[in-house]
Regions:
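ATP-binding glycine-rich loop module of kinase domains
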Residues: 5-58
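A short acidic, helix-capping loop that chelates divalent metal ions and anchors anionic groups
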Residues: 39-43, 88-89, 143-145
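Conserved structural core of kinase catalytic domains
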Residues: 46-51, 55-104
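Hydrophobic core positions within the conserved protein kinase catalytic domain
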Residues: 57, 105-109, 122
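Short, glycine/acidic-enriched loop or turn micro-motifs at the edges of active sites
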Residues: 83, 120, 139
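Catalytic-loop of the protein kinase fold
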Residues: 110-127
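C-lobe/activation-segment region of protein kinase-like
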Residues: 127-230
Length: 230
């Protein structure tokens, strides 16, 4: 893809759904997701995912800790850059980080959005100032109301955060949080029993990547942060 002469681009990820790059134009730095390089069989799905992410980011405008939507033209999505390190690298152990992350999830819920992919550590950032941020809204759930389905998805977002807290800061878990961790929804049970296996098979066989953190095993995608990731 052609770039403006004034732009400096660093490739962050390239796969069958297109490519993602960090762009510097003058003093501005942003992230660009380009679906035009997607495999032709998957180009429609790639555009749908990018369009859905644009809708989610538009819903969340102004929330600190979420990328801000800059542009979506039907093929290319541009969003603001957030400096920080992914959870699996930063391994946050400060209880305050988890309280702030809980408030961030609550802010998403108040806008009628559930992230749906917070089990993946690369989707969490520890920013340079030590506060949390959330990335990758391609499969978020956008709701007009607060029905039972939405409430369940929002609880799953929180439960995934608590699982990360159990990994990196277990001594700070409260009795209420421990009880919530034990209360898996029927959706979580079904996903673990069937859906996760199917997803892992497809990710490995078709796209060449998967690990327990949602990271890639393919050489086409290397670990990054928002100095950084996607």
């Amino acid at each position: 893809m052609k770039h403006s002469p004034a732009e400096t681009c660093e490739l962050l990820k390239a796969d069958t759904f297109g490519h993602i790059e960090r762009v510097q134009a003058g003093e501005a730095i942003f992230i660009r997701r380009d679906t035009r390089s997607a495999h032709w069989l998957l180009r429609g799905l790639a555009r749908w995912a990018a369009r859905h992410e644009a809708r989610g980011l538009d819903r969340l405008r102004g929330i600190d800790g979420v990328p801000q939507l800059l542009r979506w033209d039907g093929h290319v999505l541009e969003r603001s850059y957030i400096a920080g390190a992914p959870m699996q690298s930063a391994q946050p152990r400060d209880p305050r980080w988890y309280r702030q992350a809980h408030r961030l999830i609550r802010a998403l819920r108040e806008r009628g959005l559930a992230h749906n992919d917070l089990a993946k550590e690369p989707n969490w950032l520890v920013r340079d100032d030590g506060t949390p941020a959330v990335l990758d809204f391609q499969i978020c759930w956008i709701s007009r109301g607060r029905g039972g389905w939405f409430r369940m998805l929002a609880r799953e977002d929180l439960r995934h955060l608590l699982k990360h807290k159990r990994t990196y800061c277990p001594e700070a878990l409260t009795p209420v949080e421990r009880r919530l961790l034990k209360r898996r929804s029927w959706l979580a049970r079904a996903w673990k029993a069937t859906g996760k296996r199917v997803y892992k098979h497809i990710a490995r066989r078709w796209f060449g990547y998967w690990d327990d953190d949602g990271g890639a095993l393919s050489s086409r995608r290397r670990p990054q942060d928002e100095r950084g990731p996607t």
